[in-house]
A protein has these predicted regions:
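Non-heme di-metal
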Residues: 2-401
């Protein structure tokens, strides 16, 4: 990525917006995985009561940041539909190598720790600001190589997107229907910007970059600042038996599928693999429902859009979060001694939901019922309480949709 490049065609701008959607999506999954790995109970060991409070704070911060990454994805979708595109929610499977994006930093699933926090800091690092001496020293204290830091930035990508919205004539660029834009009245994202012209597109970009990297005089209240503070706290708390994260395996998968790239590791524990497969199926359905809500004109079907968005967003904390946390309490299998499983965020093969709202609802209802039936079968097994809660919540949601 280089801000010396001129973006002056719709095609180039749409390509960049698709890249931004992939990045926001992948980074959100990486954050969630780290959050799932943080211990909850003192019985898990490795922390005192005081340290437990710190770990709980870290988990809350990471989940909040991940929710803002989903807001960023929604903003990118609004920018995309504003100029005639459609929401893009696919991405390469994990792990994504450093060379895949110009970030020069891999995007993968690994538990909370110095290595994952270093990656998160580099994802959110302010554009055009070289890692300063204090940050390099912090990386060194955390046991990471402080000198080999070569990376682009998400902010740089949004700089290119900004140039496209600035360079292409406004009257030619914004061809999308205004009633196709999602707003906070339809989906529970309070900071969602309706993109209808150049000014609102720039406002959406500013919202993303300010939340991620912060602004020059206030980095602390940004994703970048939050992750720097976490790494400082972790480095200073090292020793004395402090172990805040569960020993989850890196880049797990319910089943290994190379069709979308990635070199994930298959979970060998059959029950954990089934739970991970259920997680993937719920996650994929959630994305389909959200993408459908953003893709089609809301005129006359506002109630349907609100219902789709409400159910999709409800699946995140009530089903995906407890399943994800619970998987990290289940052994990964004999091939991974001492390691626990985790969700792979695998994208399952499926067709797009149809434009007709009634037919789309029928497909989603049927799929929810299928997944609820699978959850009922899994509930017969010995499972962590959080997994059981996620399965029961899925049944309730399926029966009320």
């Amino acid at each position: 990525m280089s801000d010396s490049k001129t973006i002056d065609t719709r095609s180039d701008l749409l390509k960049l917006l698709c890249e931004a959607a992939e990045l926001e999506h992948g980074i959100a999954c990486s954050y969630l995985y780290a959050g799932f790995s943080l211990k909850r109970d003192l019985a898990e060991g490795g922390m005192t009561w005081e340290q437990q409070q710190t770990v709980r704070r870290w988990a809350s911060q990471i989940y909040f940041i991940a929710s803002q990454e989903m807001l960023h994805l929604a903003l990118v979708w609004n920018m995309t539909t504003a100029i005639g595109g459609t929401p893009y929610y696919l991405r390469p499977n994990f792990p994504q190598p450093s060379r895949y994006y110009p970030l020069n930093v891999p995007i993968e699933l690994e538990p909370f720790g110095p290595k994952s926090l270093r990656r998160f800091i580099l994802y959110e690092h302010p554009e055009k600001v070289a890692p300063h001496r204090k940050l390099k020293s912090l990386f060194a204290l955390a046991g990471e190589d402080a000198e080999k830091i070569e990376f682009g930035s998400v902010g740089e990508l949004y700089g290119l997107i900004r140039s496209g919205f600035s360079n292409i004539p406004e009257k030619d660029l914004f061809i999308g229907s205004r009633t196709q834009q999602m707003t906070s009245e339809l989906v529970h994202f309070p900071d969602l910007v309706k993109v209808i012209d150049r000014a609102s597109a720039i406002a959406a970009i500013d919202k993303i970059t300010h939340q991620g990297e912060g602004i020059a005089h206030d980095r602390d209240n940004s994703h970048f600042g939050a992750f720097v503070a976490m790494l400082k706290d972790l480095v200073h708390a090292k020793g004395h038996g402090f172990s805040p994260a569960r020993p989850a395996m890196r880049n797990p998968a319910a089943r290994v599928d190379t069709s979308y790239g990635g070199k994930a590791k298959a979970i060998e524990n059959p029950i954990a693999a089934e739970i991970a497969g259920l997680f993937d199926s719920v996650y994929s359905l959630m994305l389909r429902m959200l993408a459908w809500s953003f893709e089609f004109d809301s005129a006359g079907v506002e109630d349907q859009l609100q219902r789709f968005c409400a159910v999709a967003i409800d699946l995140m904390p009530r089903v995906l979060l407890p399943l994800g946390e619970g998987l990290m309490l289940m052994p990964a299998g004999p091939k991974y001694p001492g390691k626990t499983a985790g969700p792979g965020f695998g994208l399952t093969r499926h067709v797009m939901l149809p434009p007709d709202a009634k037919n789309a609802r029928t497909l989603c209802h049927e799929r929810l019922q299928e997944l609820a039936s699978l959850a009922a079968i899994l509930l017969k097994e010995q499972l962590p309480d959080s997994v059981r809660n996620g399965c029961r919540h899925l049944q309730v949601i399926a029966n009320t949709f």
